[in-house]
Structures are given as C-alpha cells and as structure tokens.
Amino acid sequence: QLERDYLPHEREARIAGKPIMGVGAVFPISNWPTYQTGDYKFKEMPDVQRVIAMDLGLINDKTVISLMYWHPYEQEAWLHSQVVVKGIDEANPMSYINHLLRPEVFGCPIVLPPDASTVGRYTMSSLSLRQFLESYELNVYPDPIRNPPYSEGRITNIKSYGINVMRQMIEMGTFRINENCQEFIHEATNYHVDPQGRFSDPDDAVDSARYALLACLNGWAEPYDGMTPQQRMATARDRIYDIKDRLHQ
C-alpha cells in the first residue's frame, strides 16, 4: 500500500517516522543539494561575498555559528560551515571566540540577533555579547538581523519569511549545504510547523542559517578577497591617493 499511495521519498519519511508534506513538514526535500569542501574555490570566484551569523543559546539550547558564501548577482548561497556549541560552554563566549578569530574568517562581517545587545545575557559579565565581540576588533554589523524591507519600506521579523525563502532556494538548488553541516540537515529534515504556525524545536542550526541568508538578502555580506580589514583599508587609501594624483596631473 505504501508503494501504491506515496512517492519514494514520502514512503521513506513515513517508514522513518519523519514529517512529510501534508502533516506540517517545512522542508519536504528528497535530495538535499549538498557539496563537499573543495568543490568550490570561493576565493577565486568573482563577486562572491561571505557573512557569519550567530544564533545564540543558553543552557538548554545551542549556540550555532554559520559561515555562508553568497553570490549577489546569481542569488546563490552556500552554507559552508557551522560551529555548534552545546551545554555549559555556550554560556561563556570565551569557549567559541577563537572560531571567530581564526585568520581565514577574521574580518568577515558578523550578524547577531536583537538580544545580543542585552547586557550580561550571553556573557555573564557587564558587557553585552555585541560589546564583547567588538572588544576583539571583530567586524560586527551594527544592526541586528531582520527581514529585508518590503517595497513600501516596512520591516518585519516574521520568521516564516526567511524559512520560505530558504525552502524555495533549496528546492531550486541555489541554496547549497556543505555535507559537514549535519546538524542543519538533521534539524531541517525533521523541521515541522503545527496548525497554529509554531515551528518545532530544536531549530538552532536552521535559525543560524536563516540569519545568514537574511544578511545576504539585506546586502550585509562583504566581498571575499582574503584580506583583513587593515589590508582592505590600506588598499582603499592607495586607491584614494591614486585618484588624487591623477587629478593633480
């Protein structure tokens, strides 16, 4: 009967006890668009940008740090890596700050949720997490994560917006997931919404990826040129001096 009534991926989901379309599944994906590290040479790809997003958790949740690459003209995204911090460690940012200070990601813009500005909430100190990260000279985007504005300029924080965009891109194959992001794939495979519109838990990895995608859609990602902020500033100064020299010739 399963073979007669359901498609192959629906049969697999039912046998595994996973939600499928029609019973609240958010990502009814049979073949996830995954890739392996090394499949894409992001540093050599023209116009590629990148951003880091953080979903913050306390003792019973996870803190998830996502690195995403983005092609603004092709509207393609790559969820390249996720660092998942669980348990007591996530309440202390010193346990994961080193992931943000690594040379290969230092200087990458970091986007945070609104409550990252709450003093002591995620730091157990007199600093907010935003202030804590800024004290390490990290490139923290000044505004909290939000949905892109509508055509009339109105801004909302409706969660379903980012989820729906992510689902559509996954279905089209323009949102690719590094196969190492198993936490995301596990959460997304089991992600569902109830009749009242409430999304299931856990969704920390999904939310972190959603924040990164929203940052890309807002135009907050920055070009991936392999430079540090200091090198970018030096290059900008050289460019300005060159322009001035030409004007005075």
Regions found by a protein language model. Name each.
Residues V51-M54, L58, K62-V64, L79-S81:
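A conserved active-site cap/scaffold subdomain adjacent to cofactor or substrate pockets
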Residues E74-R198, G219-W220, G226, D242-Q249:
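Mg2+-dependent endonuclease catalytic cores in nucleic-acid-processing enzymes, primarily RNase H-like
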Residues Q196-T228:
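Acidic, Mg2+-coordinating catalytic module of metal-dependent nucleases/exonucleases
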